[in-house]
Amino acid sequence: MAETKYEPRLKAEYVSRIRQALREQFSYANEMQIPKLDKIVINMGVGEATADSKKPTVAAADLAAIAGQKPVITRARNSIAGFKVREDMPIGAKVTLRGARMYEFMDRLINIALPRVRDFRGLNPKSFDGRGNFAMGIKEHIVFPEINYDKVDQMWGMDIIVCTTAPTDDEARALLKEFNFPFRQ
């Protein structure tokens, strides 16, 4: 019996349609020059961690449900007296997605989570870093379908960074537009 290998919907779309569209738009000489997604990093900073050291663990559990992968607890690199933060204190969680999980997360982000954001008018097209990476923030993590709204005691925001192999922002913007990222006009 032949096994059928699972391929995420967006990856199949990238291989079949998006690569060719980018190749025609930017007239690349080499197949390897065509930009692709490298990774997606999701970071959750928990400001209340100074008062309650269990908060980053709860945030990490929510992040694991959203990403489908166990996050790493981030710790403070140095002490900051003004914020009551001590060195090596847990202050958040982050996860790096690659491969199939990255495409599946991006599919849920574009088609489910972003439309559920209150007063959403589109992503800022200027949020690129100059090297082809796109960063965005979400104020409430409950926009993801994996989070049960009734069981949430506190809402956290998160940073989502989409890293691409594109050398310029214009090429990365074209790649993400092909993936149907809802950029502001």
UniProtKB/Swiss-Prot annotation:
* GO CC terms: ribonucleoprotein complex; ribosome
Q: Name one Pfam family in it.
A: Ribosomal_L5_C
User: Keywords, A to Z?
Assistant: Ribonucleoprotein, Ribosomal protein, RNA-binding, rRNA-binding, tRNA-binding
Give GO terms: molecular function aspect only: rRNA binding; structural constituent of ribosome; tRNA binding
Does RNA-binding appear among the keywords? yes
Top-level taxon of origin: Bacteria
User: What are its GO biological-process terms?
Assistant: translation
Instruction: Identify the InterPro entries for this entry.
Output: Ribosomal_uL5, Ribosomal_uL5_bac-type, Ribosomal_uL5_C, Ribosomal_uL5_CS, Ribosomal_uL5_dom_sf, Ribosomal_uL5_N
Task: Quote the NCBIfam families the UniProt record gives.
Answer: PRK00010.1
- Family, per the entry? Belongs to the universal ribosomal protein uL5 family.
| Subunit text | Part of the 50S ribosomal subunit; part of the 5S rRNA/L5/L18/L25 subcomplex. Contacts the 5S rRNA and the P site tRNA. Forms a bridge to the 30S subunit in the 70S ribosome.
Physiological role: This is one of the proteins that bind and probably mediate the attachment of the 5S RNA into the large ribosomal subunit, where it forms part of the central protuberance. In the 70S ribosome it contacts protein S13 of the 30S subunit (bridge B1b), connecting the 2 subunits; this bridge is implicated in subunit movement. Contacts the P site tRNA; the 5S rRNA and some of its associated proteins might help stabilize positioning of ribosome-bound tRNAs.
Name listed for the protein in its UniProt record: Large ribosomal subunit protein uL5
What organism does this protein naturally occur in?
Answer: Allorhizobium ampelinum (strain ATCC BAA-846 / DSM 112012 / S4) (Agrobacterium vitis (strain S4))
Q: Tell me the organism's taxonomic lineage.
A: Bacteria, Pseudomonadati, Pseudomonadota, Alphaproteobacteria, Hyphomicrobiales
